[in-house]
Regions:
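N-terminal export leaders
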Residues: 6-13
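N-terminal secretory signal peptides that target proteins for export/translocation
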Residues: 1-4
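Short, linear, compositionally biased motifs with a strong N-terminal bias
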Residues: 14-16, 56
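A short alpha-helical cap/connector motif
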Residues: 24-161, 166-187, 191-226
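N-terminal signal peptide c-region/cleavage motif recognized by signal peptidases
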Residues: 19-21
């Protein structure tokens, strides 16, 4: 079990390094001064099954209402699948875009997503998008104030994604952290710039049981070490 978790952690670290390495390579102009490398990495992902194609098709339709950039959605998918996640939690469903990226991974790992949304209209739209994508059986949408409804959760949880009211990030962290398993991940969106919550940053940066890295300039990825 311990070796398996070490392998998973190594895979996650590699997944985090790939975007940064590719970006640096493109800025340098490619190996040995050759043509720029990595342009094709900006293309949409290729589906390896009809189930994936269905999810990706719906995600492409939802993009105009997206709450996270596509590259962050792909990061969610990579981290979730690399972790072999069985239980994923999302605080801030919106219209379901990021949830679809979770679903791409979870239909491979055999996992489920519980996602919390404050607005009933957005929750209804998300449910319809999950139905169109054929993933409604692995996604549960809970409507209400997540500061209260998240108390329904029981552990262990493998990965959490927080993309809701920014002043509430610290409270969400305090509620979900005890539920996250050792080796689990907490992702927090819009963590830098004007929208950032200093209390959240201080909480993850000052906890010796956590290790945090900023990815794509706005996604804080936190590993729960123990």
């Amino acid at each position: 079990m311990m070796m398996s978790r070490r392998i998973q952690t190594a895979a996650l670290v590699a997944a985090l390094m790939i975007p940064a390495a590719a970006s640096a390579q493109m800025r340098r102009g490619g190996p040995r001064g050759g043509p720029p490398f990595g342009g094709s990495l900006n293309n949409p992902p290729l589906a390896d099954s009809e189930a994936e194609k269905r999810i990706l098709d719906v995600a492409a339709q939802v993009e105009r209402y997206l709450s996270v950039p596509p590259e962050d959605g792909r990061l969610i998918r990579i981290l979730t699948e690399a972790a072999g996640a069985k239980r994923a939690v999302e605080i801030g469903t919106s219209t379901g875009y990021s949830g679809l990226w979770f679903a791409l991974a979870l239909q491979k790992t055999g996992g489920t997503l519980t996602t919390f949304e404050y607005d009933p209209g957005r929750a209804a739209t998300a449910r319809e998008n999950f139905r169109k994508a054929g993933v409604e059986k692995i996604v549960t949408v809970i409507v209400g104030d997540a500061h209260d409804t998240v108390k329904q959760l029981a552990g262990p949880v493998d990965i959490v994604f927080i993309d809701a009211d920014k002043p509430g990030y610290r409270d969400y962290l305090d509620k979900v952290l005890p539920l996250v398993r050792p080796g689990g991940l907490i992702l927090a969106h819009n963590i830098s710039g004007r929208e950032s919550n200093p209390e959240y940053v201080d909480a993850v940066a000052g906890n010796p049981a956590l290790e945090t890295i900023l990815v794509n300039g706005q996604m804080a990825v936190t590993l729960k070490k123990r």
